[in-house]
Amino acid sequence: MISVSDDYLSEEQFKSLTSIHLEYNKVHWVGKKSNPENALHELIQSINEEGIGATAWYNIRPINPKLHNDISSYTTYMGKSYKPSKLPKRTYLYYIHAPKTGGQLIIPDIDEEIKPISNRLVSFPIQYDHKIESYTGNRVSIGIIFWPEIPSIYKNANENNILTFNRLWEEEDKRNTI
């Protein structure tokens, strides 16, 4: 059900991933057959999950961690669902930096808490709602979802390309709080 893999990347791969400069506030699309351009793309392709490609995003510091579901977050914009008919199977989280205290991944459906540890890859069924426990310090993770069918909101994404998109859930959250 939940998979945890510690020391997922080699020391060299981890160093490369933590030293690249990317747009952290964007969703990164990496097509399954694309040529990796950096360590983030290599991380995504190393997971080897089924799908046309994957979306990945950096979680630096959630302002107000809330229980959420990644399918809804990734496929809803302006109140409209762009959910594909064939859904991903799992959510992946890769931890780059662990906080001083707290920051556990909480999955209420199965009464599970997973501690954030640097260089840890975690995956769980995508339908599970989850959130991050409050924490102190710096916590950085990368969320990754492999799509067997691309949501129509991600225009021009395909198995051969690499693109960046705005974070739909941030735009949706702003719209719902105004």
Walk through the language-model features, giving the residues of each.
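Fe(II)/2-oxoglutarate oxygenase catalytic core
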Residues: 1-121, 127-178
